[in-house]
């Protein structure tokens, strides 16, 4: 159910618990959750082509085994798979490829695959951020359908370009300026236009 519809049926406190309940976790509860999620990712990633390549045939079953078998990596370790967008090497087909700069612009770009599951998590976290940003106290937040939001992020194919479309899957907001209508504007032009529209 969309967040917009949930707002009509559930008490604000219930929504707060669903999206921001992690704030009440103890450090041990939080770490238990993080370890469980990491174990899920490990089981998905290990048998993938990229997992096999980086692990050199090893199959770690725990986070500790992964740390022992695979030291810290850099984007360089993934570049030959991610730059040409070799999705057959990944554990899940990407829904979209996002790009960002690499080494402060010394190299042209980095590509990163985002699965539908990652987009859902991104959206959930975005709603949680909006709840916390508009909260006056725990369980009380103030944003509604149609609220105007100054959009100061870079457009797609950058990660911030996902915000308007993902948020609008859950709650219809008015983005200033609309990222689809004004995608041809430069970053500074969009910021100026957004401020002008908001005044």
Regions found by a protein language model. Give the residues of each.
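Nucleotide 5′-phosphate-binding alpha/beta core
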Residues: 1-99, 103-199
């Amino acid at each position: 159910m969309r967040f917009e519809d949930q707002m009509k049926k559930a008490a604000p406190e219930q929504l707060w618990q669903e999206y921001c309940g992690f704030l009440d976790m103890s450090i041990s509860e939080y770490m238990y959750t993080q370890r469980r999620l990491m174990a899920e990712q490990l089981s998905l990633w290990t048998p993938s082509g990229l997992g096999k390549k980086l692990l050199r045939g090893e199959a770690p079953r725990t986070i500790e085994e992964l740390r022992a078998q695979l030291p810290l990596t850099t984007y360089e370790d993934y570049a030959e798979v991610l730059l040409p967008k070799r999705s057959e090497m990944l554990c899940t087909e990407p829904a979209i490829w996002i790009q960002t700069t690499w080494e402060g612009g010394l190299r042209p770009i980095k590509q990163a695959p985002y699965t539908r599951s990652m987009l859902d998590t991104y959206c959930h976290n975005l709603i949680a951020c909006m709840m916390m940003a508009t909260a006056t106290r725990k369980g009380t937040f103030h944003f509604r359908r149609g609220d105007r939001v100054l959009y100061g992020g870079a457009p797609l194919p950058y990660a911030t370009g996902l915000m308007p479309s993902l948020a609008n899957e859950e709650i219809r907001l008015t983005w200033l300026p609309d990222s689809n209508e004004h995608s041809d504007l430069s970053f500074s032009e969009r910021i100026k236009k957004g401020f002008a529209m908001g005044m």
